[in-house]
Amino acid sequence: MKYLIDTVILIDHLNGIKKATQWLKKNKDSFISPITRAELLVGAEEKEKHSIKFLLDSFETLSINNEIADLAAELRKKHRLKLPDAFQAAIAIINEVKLVTRNTKDFKREMGFIKIPYKL
């Protein structure tokens, strides 16, 4: 199984959460999205950007296209997701991968495309 890594998992890793680091080590062939890249970089201190880009570049980035944008709009409306979360979900669904997240507020396991690898 391949996975799309949600931003919160990488933030946990960068903050030294061992469960996140262990999960990432076991799933090195996972993907990120342009959403994750932007969210991590916007919150980064200037001195951290190089190491964060190095981490991000270690994953293949799945792109966004019109099919994904259309599905994101549907998911946003149906599940009342924030737009970035709707895009993450749409990218996972279209690419037939699981979205790995710790965000149980917006994503529910029963959505089918979600994997919650650990809890804090």
Predicted regions and their residues:
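Acidic, PIN/NYN-like endoribonuclease modules and their adjacent C-terminal/linker elements
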Residues: 89-120
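Short, well-structured N-terminal submotif of metal-dependent ribonuclease cores
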Residues: 1-32, 41-57
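Acidic catalytic patch
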Residues: 58-78
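Short glycine/serine/threonine/alanine-rich loop segments
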Residues: 77, 81, 97
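Alpha-helix capping/helix-boundary segments
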Residues: 9-10, 36, 68, 87-88, ...
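General small-molecule cofactor/ligand-binding pocket signal
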Residues: 31, 62, 114-117
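Generic structural signal for small/hydrophobic residues in well-ordered secondary structure
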Residues: 6-7, 40, 72, 92, ...
